[in-house]
Amino acid sequence: MVALFKSSLGRPEQHQTPQIRISPASSNVEHSEKQPRRDFRVKKYVAPGFSQLNWSKLVASGQNLSGVEKPIPVTKEELAKHKTKEDCWIAIRGKVYNVSAYLPYHPAGQKRILDYAGRDATVIFMKFHAWVNEEALLKTSFVGFLV
């Protein structure tokens, strides 16, 4: 059986991989070579020590990152006051989170969150992170309910 795979010189034969070409006419795939695809989900590099694993460890530590002792009712007016890098609150599905500590951990960069600081970010969050459990991700950052 080994002889089948050896050439007359005793070396393994070099096999050529056949080149298969699919013409656009025989394919249902549309090609858009003229315009490059704009990918809004571009990941940025985070600083060492600020990976999602590091964030998970911080959350698991139980440290209160919300800035409040216990959950409070938050009005839209109060939410709007917290829109800086040092004091960044967002609302997702009726819950308000202080995401100031999370900013350097966000894979797409801080600006993506800061663009929605002080506002209800449910729609944009669901557009890009529908599969993410924000309650678990931000449980130690929970400020209260949006009223």
UniProtKB/Swiss-Prot annotation:
Feature: compositional bias, Polar residues: 15-29
Domain Cytochrome b5 heme-binding residues, every copy: 71-147
Superkingdom: Eukaryota
Binding site for heme: H106, H129
A Pfam match: Cyt-b5
GO MF annotations, alphabetized: cytochrome-b5 reductase activity, acting on NAD(P)H; heme binding; metal ion binding
Entry GO CC: cytoplasm; cytosol; nucleus
Keywords: Heme, Iron, Metal-binding
Gene3D superfamilies from the UniProt entry: Cytochrome b5-like heme/steroid binding domain (3.10.120.10)
PROSITE patterns for this protein: CYTOCHROME_B5_1, CYTOCHROME_B5_2
Region (Disordered): 1-37
Family: Belongs to the cytochrome b5 family.
Name listed for the protein in its UniProt record: Uncharacterized protein C1F12.10c
Organism: Schizosaccharomyces pombe (strain 972 / ATCC 24843) (Fission yeast)
